[in-house]
Amino acid sequence: METEKSSYLEVMGEHPMNKVLDFLLTFDEFDYSLTEIAQNAGVSYSTLMLFFSKLEANSIVKCTRKVGKSKMFMINKENPVVQDLIKLHWQIAKQEMHKELKKEMVVV
């Protein structure tokens, strides 16, 4: 079963980093282990490890707590770059929604 791509991924492309950002921006109220991030974003753990340290070093994500040996992470909403990403994420969603509404108006 193929899952439907988000509007964000339709516009920005399906690069693994975009998939991770899309997941973290969409589900921004909770923190996740690296394994959960990889699974929910649809990327392999080894691929996530190629770039996740850059996201952490640039404060795009932040470590929120430690559960056993696992660190938990979430998107860092205090970072101005992330705030701009959130705005972009919503703008893309709004744009796609308007496109769909126009299609429905034409069909009806």
Where do the protein language model's features map onto the residues?
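Short, cationic-aromatic polyanion-contact patches
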Residues: 7-17, 33, 66-88
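Pre-recognition alpha-helix immediately N-terminal to the DNA-recognition helix
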Residues: 18-23
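Short coil turns linking two alpha-helices in DNA-binding domains
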Residues: 44-45, 51
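Amphipathic alpha-helical dimerization/coiled-coil segments
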Residues: 80-108
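Short helix-capping/hinge SLiMs at alpha-helix to coil transitions
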Residues: 25-30
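A short acidic, leucine-rich amphipathic alpha-helix
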Residues: 36-39
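Short beta-strand "wing" residues that participate in macromolecule-binding interfaces
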Residues: 62-63
